[in-house]
């Protein structure tokens, strides 16, 4: 049996703001902090509820600032307020847990760089006016504007315009899954604030809270909860304690956090395309060798790494494509194989009689689980004959070391696009893209898959021959509820309330 390693950790190559807001670039500077059932996806959590006796919840208190939401749902200042905005507003499409887009306010058609958004007819805003293509186009403009939380996912759009009941979109480069990015809120300015077409509408407004009631004119399935109370918290940094004290009923937390482990709350994993990985220095002899990177991947027990090191739930993966992605059939979790790992290193002449391999692992000391993860990786690699020296640095020093190439391996975390845009992994930008460059063959396979939607399995097979980076896992977000609520929740990062039409208490 393999020895079990007992150290903890995880890294993110990002700056995390627990309840922060504003623009979040797709790169190694994101926001995080949850805890949920280890390794479970939202679908796995839901499968155990089929035979449970269920009763309906009448109301729910959600941490959110109503005024900032209706002032601009695209760039409000608080993470949970942005998520709660999707109760009042709809997005053009809905994204499933398998990264498939479903028509909502629009039906998307097209291919390559040319796309048509056909607007659903008969949809009403809460002020009684009808949704038009101009409303969708205006909302797209707002979502692309400076300061919008959605700006970075829409930078590939070259132009967009209204034509009858459609919005015509031209992209800079072909993207087969462009529709996956259309998850921004659609809103219309009415009476000095933005109204929506969503599942709820304003009912009453008090000094510290706002009550929303079900939208009786909603075009889709009615929500199961009759009313939602939006509770404005004076201090955003005490949101976790507000949940613990019962001042709110639910809270979304993104990324690594020590707070969740101390919460007496039920929690649900939120599917997110947030990749944890090891990067390799292309200018060091050992890590520039693809066989060494293959050996490192083979030497890792990713499931145990998640179990012992992460402060959140996650899904193990040795590929940079999410395990739930519907267009990928290649298994994304390889079994740990120390014997093969050792043989690869021996064949490369790096281990064996009289020789050993020593590597440094750079990681950022910020965050709740980075040091634990780095330590656990070092413990696992030591069993394959690799001696790892840990180099933990504060964030700015960490990035300086990456810029100067002062590392063999580095621990990174990045939020990838829901359209499976992997370019930030190997195209260097501000605080992302460090490490080995893929071969032209691998890049061509990726571009084919990304632009056409076909060939993801071919890309996966080529990727495992090179491992320009070594994926570890995809971190889930966490949707926390007070113990009073045990609901049938299925959530995705773009819509925490994805199946609120079927939320019921499980007795």
List the predicted regions and their residue ranges.
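Extracytoplasmic/peripheral linker and loop segments enriched in polar/acidic and small residues
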Residues: 49, 390-398, 423-486, 506-507
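N-terminal lobe/hinge region of extracytoplasmic solute-binding protein
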Residues: 63-111, 118, 141
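Gly/Pro-rich hinge or "lid" segments in bacterial periplasmic/extracellular proteins
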Residues: 78, 170-229, 235-238, 343
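Aromatic- and charge-enriched surface segment that lines or borders ligand/interaction sites
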Residues: 106-147, 286
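Extracellular/periplasmic solute-recognition and catalytic clefts
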Residues: 159-161, 203-211, 229-284
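A bilobed periplasmic-binding-protein/Venus flytrap-type ligand-binding module shared by bacterial periplasmic
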Residues: 213-217, 267-295, 299, 308, ...
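Append "and occasionally in soluble cytosolic enzymes with long acidic Gly/Pro-rich linkers
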Residues: 288-379
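Ligand/substrate-recognition segments at binding pockets and active sites
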Residues: 348-416
């Amino acid at each position: 049996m393999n020895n079990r390693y007992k150290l903890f950790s995880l890294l993110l190559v990002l700056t995390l703001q627990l309840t922060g807001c504003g623009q979040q670039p797709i790169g190694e500077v994101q926001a995080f902090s949850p805890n949920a059932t280890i390794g479970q996806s939202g679908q796995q959590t839901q499968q155990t509820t089929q035979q449970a006796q269920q009763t309906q919840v009448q109301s729910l208190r959600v941490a959110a600032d109503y005024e900032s939401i209706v002032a601009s749902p695209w760039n409000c200042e608080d993470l949970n307020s942005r998520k709660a905005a999707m109760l009042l507003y709809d997005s053009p499409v809905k994204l499933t847990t398998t990264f498939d887009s479903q028509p909502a306010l629009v039906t998307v058609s097209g291919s390559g760089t040319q796309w048509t958004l056909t607007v659903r007819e008969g949809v009403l805003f809460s002020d009684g006016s009808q949704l038009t293509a101009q409303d969708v186009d205006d909302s797209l403009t707002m979502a692309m504007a400076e300061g919008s939380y959605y700006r970075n996912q829409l930078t590939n759009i070259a132009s967009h315009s209204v034509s009858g009941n459609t919005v015509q979109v031209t992209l800079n480069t072909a993207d087969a899954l462009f529709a996956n990015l259309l998850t921004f809120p659609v809103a219309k300015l009415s009476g000095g604030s933005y109204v929506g077409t969503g599942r709820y509408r304003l009912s009453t407004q008090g000094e510290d809270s706002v009550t929303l009631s079900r939208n009786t004119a909603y075009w889709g399935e009615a929500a199961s909860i009759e009313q939602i109370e939006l509770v404005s918290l004076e201090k955003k940094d005490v949101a976790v304690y507000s949940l613990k004290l019962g001042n709110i009923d639910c809270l979304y937390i993104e990324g690594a956090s020590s707070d969740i482990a101390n919460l007496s709350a039920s929690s649900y994993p939120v599917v997110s395309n947030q990749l944890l990985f090891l990067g390799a220095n292309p200018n060091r002899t050992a890590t520039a060798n693809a066989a060494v990177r293959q050996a490192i991947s083979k030497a890792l027990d990713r499931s145990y790494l998640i179990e012992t090191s992460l402060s959140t739930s996650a899904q193990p993966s040795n590929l940079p494509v999410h395990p739930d992605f519907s267009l990928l059939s290649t298994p994304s979790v390889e079994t740990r194989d120390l014997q093969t790992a050792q043989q690869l290193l021996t064949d490369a002449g790096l281990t064996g009689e009289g020789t050993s391999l020593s590597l440094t692992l750079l990681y950022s000391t910020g965050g709740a689980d980075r040091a634990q993860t780095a330590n656990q990786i070092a413990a696992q690699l030591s069993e394959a004959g690799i001696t790892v020296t840990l180099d933990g640095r504060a964030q700015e020093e960490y990035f300086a070391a990456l810029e100067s190439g002062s590392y063999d391996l580095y621990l990174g975390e990045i939020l990838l696009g829901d359209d499976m845009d992997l370019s930030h992994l190997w195209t260097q930008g501000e605080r992302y893209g460090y490490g080995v460059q893929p071969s032209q063959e691998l890049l061509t396979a990726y571009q084919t898959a990304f632009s056409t939607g076909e060939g993801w399995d071919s890309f996966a097979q080529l990727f495992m021959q090179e491992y320009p980076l070594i994926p570890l896992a995809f971190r889930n977000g966490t949707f926390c509820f007070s113990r009073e609520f045990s609901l049938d929740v299925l959530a995705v990062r773009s819509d925490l309330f994805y199946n609120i039409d079927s939320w019921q208490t499980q007795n």
